[in-house]
Amino acid sequence: MKFYIEDLLVYFPYSYIYPEQYSYMVALKRSLDNGGPCILEMPSGTGKTVSLLSLISSYQVKNPSIKLIYCSRTVPEIEQATEEARRVLQYRNSEMGEESPKTLCMSMSSRRNLCIQPRVSEERDGKVVDALCRELTSSWNRESPTSEKCKFFENFESNGKEILLEGVYSLEDLKEYGLKHQMCPYFLSRHMLNFANIVIFSYQYLLDPKIASLISSSFPSNSIVVFDEAHNIDNVCINALSINIDNKLLDTSSKNIAKINKQIEDIKKVDEKRLKDEYQRLVNGLARSGSTRADETTSDPVLPNDVIQEAVPGNIRKAEHFISLLRRVVDYLKSRLKSQMLLSESPLAFLQGLYHATQISSRTLRFCSSRLSSLLRTLRINDVNQFSGISLIADFATLVGTYNNGFLIIIEPYYQRQNNTYDQIFQFCCLDASIGMKPIFDKYRSVVITSGTLSPLDIYTKMLNFRPTVVERLTMSLNRNCICPCILTRGSDQISISTKFDVRSDTAVVRNYGALLVEVSAIVPDGIICFFTSYSYMEQIVSVWNEMGLLNNILTNKLIFVETSDPAESALALQNYKKACDSGRGAVLLSVARGKVSEGIDFDNQYGRCVILYGIPYINTESKVLRARLEFLRDRYQIRENEFLTFDAMRTASQCVGRVIRGKSDYGIMIFADKRYNRLDKRNKLPQWILQFCQPQHLNLSTDMAISLSKTFLREMGQPFSREEQLGKSLWSLEHVEKQSTSKPPQQQNSAINSTITTSTTTTTTTSTISETHLT
């Protein structure tokens, strides 16, 4: 359908639209008109992605110079967004005909997901793929007449830069195009990003400085940036600027230094001019000159605004001097890790200690990362991953030399499970997520932060330190209540249930938790997903259930599958869980909050008719890094410790229960099995689209009350439900859309405005005449 939102004609590729989709697009349009950042929460499974793409692609028709940069978390989400973009653009083009603008939508991923070179693509490890690719595509390898080359890359270098693509290219499309034209999909994608109207890739290509400066630094400032599924965006920013160092890494770094030193000595004997040329480039401030796109590995780990645009200091221009400096840094870090005490200090205090011991200044440290990259290129090293140890040390040196505020260094014992010993770990921690977001907010005209679970919205604006132009928290419009939340506070024996540390192992609590699953598995059809607070607690409670005979009772109703920390095992368990649901046998999947199942996998329709959340998934508060971050948030942004911990736990809980609702025709039971969920300060941090169903009869339930409520709910959901019943309330046709005040064509809006002005003028004239008569 086509409809107006104010002065914008929107092309929406479906015949019907949800009211919340329309409201979402109105808020998004208002944000784009105003510019600046916005934060939008929309119910899970109500078509957020297609709403975004429809509105923004229509906005691009009116503003053709604007680029859309769409960021998501995982490869499946990138592929899903690309297919939605294909659907939106096909509809727009069919409606506009010859007037439709030529549009390129380009997705992007790693070499591992795009490589088509037979020998390289059969490797599963991404680091190995990267190394083999660089071996075949580096400029020095290609100069050698005897070395093996990649024909796909050679064809791209010869013809790829002249190609003008049009249409939508998913990762699979790129690989097919590459095979058909014998051209490298990875480098083609990287090249075409600069010309694409719509770019779809992962967060790291924009938020991780080491990658962003190579991939997205040339994007125009009038672009629209969308962070979809952005409920964990603060953690992405923090992880991109944090580094952990242990003794094993330092030993690897020492070996790396020795190996590099030997290669320098070898080159001096056969090709000393190469080192002299590099020295001259560094003197002239041209560290990257002479390198090609294929030679570049990663860039500086610091944000673009903080990169020093000047020549490398004289004391590290010579390769041997630089290696000597790295050796001193590594030795100093080794000495710091010898202490068995827990230590925390600011970067400034660390730099003072380093300078006192080694005479290395912070200014010199800032150049370590770029200097090492230059040296590895000069030495013509393809497999840079074998030097990952010293590369991480160089990244740390650059970061600690650049940043002070919002960072902390923590040295603490770390338990090594495989050796059953404690080893010291040196952690350079970013505490302030706003540092990573600031360059994005500063550069781009519009930044959209959106997800189904962003509540409470105000805490994101504090943590990321921005003032949104638009804030919207949408509810779900429904003709029937397809969500049944149950706040379970006690078992059928009226004993309170909770995973609080002091009661979580209580026999009565564990028994009640098991009895709940037995009863739920007897009445709920198809699939049930259970989330525990940790792997250790899941193992503990399942073991006790087995001793009590509860697992056998569950198995009479459904099969049981378990998520583990091993990705391959979990993938197999998930595959068999879905098979059991498809066959009608039904299944229970035992998984962990903050695990893979809780974040990236949807359980629509028969795969998720009920989700049980055992306890509140609080993060481990014993972590010294977390304690430091909590203190920072309290002092800097006035976010209280308990406020953040509850917020973090409830967004994780929302993600878990949101897995089972993937559309309005879907339905599911959400059981929050912990008495603490009944407290208002916890419950109010759930998304609005869940809260709207938390009526008094859903609160403070015992197991038998929850089972009774669930039976009634499932009977209601089993009744026939047609599209006609939804029309007008939870589903709109074009007729319903056009009745909205914001959906009048511009001519009608202008007529209404002119009519108002005319009426106002007439009234003013009449009033003026009366006043003059009165004065006379």
UniProtKB/Swiss-Prot annotation:
Residues 755-776 have a biased composition (Low complexity). Its cofactor is Mg(2+); [4Fe-4S] cluster. It catalyses: Couples ATP hydrolysis with the unwinding of duplex DNA at the replication fork by translocating in the 5'-3' direction. This creates two antiparallel DNA single strands (ssDNA). The leading ssDNA polymer is the template for DNA polymerase III holoenzyme which synthesizes a continuous strand; ATP + H2O = ADP + phosphate + H(+). Residues 7-277 form the Helicase ATP-binding domain. Residues 736-776 are annotated as: Disordered. Component of the 7-subunit TFIIH core complex composed of XPB/repB, XPD/repD, gtf2h1, gtf2h2, gtf2h3, gtf2h4 and gtf2h5, which is active in NER. The core complex associates with the 3-subunit CDK-activating kinase (CAK) module composed of cycH/cyclin H, cdk7 and mnat1 to form the 10-subunit holoenzyme (holo-TFIIH) active in transcription. This is General transcription and DNA repair factor IIH helicase subunit XPD. It comes from Dictyostelium discoideum.
